[in-house]
Design a protein with these regions (language model features):
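Bacterial N-terminal signal peptides that target proteins for export
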Residues: 3-15
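Polar helix-capping/helix-linker motif
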Residues: 7, 195-196
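Short alpha-helical segments used as structural interaction elements across diverse proteins
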Residues: 8-9, 68, 203
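C-terminal segment of classical bacterial N-terminal signal peptides
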Residues: 22-30
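Active-site-adjacent loops and short helices of periplasmic peptidoglycan-processing enzymes
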Residues: 30-184, 188, 193-195
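Conserved small/polar residues in nucleotide/adenosyl-binding loops
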Residues: 198-205
């Protein structure tokens, strides 16, 4: 029985390590007793990936600012479109002045020069590995026309997945009123991501 833990993390969480850091998988015996994990978090959830059974939780439905865990949904939407053919890996994406990182210490960035382009696949890597806010915003604009419209797409996907305590306002996770998620919802998103990536040969190659 595979299990996934979704704890609550801080603003500076690097999405490039979310599989290892925010969702650490472990194998447990089907009949073994599950002890409540001792985690220094205000919210977490431990689920069986195969069945969705909740093995342990604390404030799992309580919304909180998801910070860079937001980029899980951003990258999920990009990967969906790559698999459907709506996006191509080598498709150029413009780094607009609005998306461009200006070197602020408050942001994690890929640092693509302003008014230049980078391929979709490089932008995706910049989002996942570097937690790039610039890459996230550029891809949001490329797909949705604006980050606001892309956030609407994020919320549509969240509804499909069954994320009932989540609302996205942007593609980066930067603090914004109304931008929230729960550990329970992020577990559902993690399941969707794993299902998408591990049932696709093309995604496996990436």
């Amino acid at each position: 029985m595979k299990a996934i833990v979704i704890p609550q993390y801080t603003q500076r969480l690097m999405v490039g390590t979310f599989v290892a850091a925010s969702f650490f998988a472990t194998t447990v015996q089907a009949n073994a007793a599950i002890q409540q994990p001792e985690l220094d978090n205000s919210a977490f959830i431990l689920i069986d990936y195969d069945t969705g059974t909740v093995l342990a939780q604390k404030n799992a439905a309580q919304p909180f600012p998801p910070a860079s865990l937001t980029k899980m949904m951003t990258s999920y939407i990009i990967e969906q479109r790559l698999l459907s053919g709506a996006l191509k890996e080598n498709e150029p994406v413009l780094m607009t002045p609005e998306a461009w990182c200006k070197g602020s210490s408050e942001e994690s960035c890929m640092y693509v020069p302003v008014n230049t382009t980078a391929p979709v696949i490089d932008m995706l890597k910049g989002i996942i590995i570097q937690s790039g806010n610039d890459a996230s915003k550029a891809m949001a604009q490329h797909i949705g026309g604006s980050e606001t419209t892309f956030a609407d797409l994020m919320n549509e996907e969240a509804k499909k997945i069954g994320m009932t305590h989540t609302h996205f306002m942007n593609a980066t996770g930067m603090p914004q009123e109304g931008h929230q998620a729960s550990a329970e919802d992020l577990a559902k998103l993690a399941q969707a991501i794993i299902c998408l990536l591990y049932t696709s040969d093309a995604a496996d190659e990436r």
